[in-house]
Amino acid sequence: MAYVLHLGRTGYREAWDLQRSLAGAVSQGAIPDTVLFLEHPPVVTLGRRTDESAELHIPENAEVDIVETDRGGKSTFHGPGQLVCYPILDLKRHGRDVKEYVRKLEDALIGTLAALGVDGTRLEGLTGVWLPRPPRKIASIGVHVSRWVTTHGYALNVDLDPAPFTDWITACGLEDAMFTTIARELDRPVTVDEVRPHAVAALEDVFGLELEEIPAEDGIGLWAQPIHAQLAG
């Protein structure tokens, strides 16, 4: 058994604090593996390999937060209309192989897209999920692993303006990277709520999880005590 929480729109720093709290609880065996699904307000996050002077081109008047993180990878953009998934998994139960874990996240994304009729794939030498001919990125991955417990995860473009990816940052360090969304590929409106059940099912399939939904309202601060204590109780 594992837990899944649907947090709705949640600030990046609040979600990061929650991940760290949960990771500590998972590491100690207080709670099982736990998966968070959410959306973020507009934010640019910087991975450990970000070169700010080369990658960031954010206008001074842009209403966007910028956060340095401990995840792998370079800079990326999060915003409403993007499904973000943060699996807090103990890799001692999932193979103790970080590269294989990232490949499984890609498999889960490809499965999610396939359920919606979108043909996602990998591109050699690049992390994330893409659509071929011409190559365009539809999902980003960046993870952190400490004591074999994972934080951060993936961001799947459902229906959002891709301009920040190309105008504000040199995403993934690729000058000419193209970006797309599920809505653009299907040529119809698509909501995060429509995509989320397929994402849950794909994670269950790829990681062999049985996800139990824990009731959660929109955001952090729902629990009077630390979340890991609440779930362990």
Where are these regions (language model features)?
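N-terminal lobe of the biotin/lipoate ligase/transferase fold
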Residues: M1-I138, P189-V190, I220-G233
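A structural signal for short, well-ordered beta-strand segments
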Residues: C85-P87, T127, I141-V143, Y154-V158, ...
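C-terminal accessory segment of soluble enzyme catalytic cores
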Residues: W130, D159-G233
